Amino acid sequence: MLQKTKGIVLSYIRYRETSIIVKIYTEVLGLQSYIVNGVRSSGNAKSGGGRMGLYQPLTLLELVVYHQERANLHRIREIKCPEPFVYLPMDFQKTGIVLFLTELLSKSLKSEEPNPVLYQFLHHSIHVLDGQQEGVQNFHLQFLLKLSRYLGFATPTADDFLEEVSPYISADAIDREAVERLLLEPYGAPIPLNGERRRHVLQMILQFYRLHVADFGDLKSLPVLQEMQG
């Protein structure tokens, strides 16, 4: 049946010579995969669903899709991007954050059950990242801590968080002050963290996710993010 929904692109893989399979987290249908035929052919580069730019990580979409219960792959009838990014594609640092976040979201979002509250959080956060001018280097840290609330495993305080991760983290990497401020402050708040403290906090947060997300493992994009942030 036809279903209208908003969606956030997580990733895609090439399929055959000219097609892709794209993974999209939707507002109405949860996590879904769609096959898009001919999108990589030169003759279809600017027509309808054939624009590869629509399938870049974290792109915000409006979709009309053919959805069949119990099917693993679905098809897109109509697609548009009513909220194109303004700054994100041209910002080197933000691009690194996007690659990191999409890999993490692909590991963390596994349910086909819709979660409109989670979707709205993701939608809002992506808008913030696009427009944010100050404190961008801390965005991914705040995002991951906030996301854990919507995934159902957030801790109420920094002390509770540290109690969970401290057995797995070296003592010199524990930074209670940073975690507390990142938990409490809104996006963009001036939280002075140097590169070393930022890496330590991220190490703690990723360990926290490993404790709660099955098969979380390591993130291939992490070295790229750390190199970009210095």
Role assignments for model-derived ranges:
Residues M1-T18, Y25-G230:
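Non-catalytic alpha-helical scaffolds and adjoining flexible linkers that form interface surfaces
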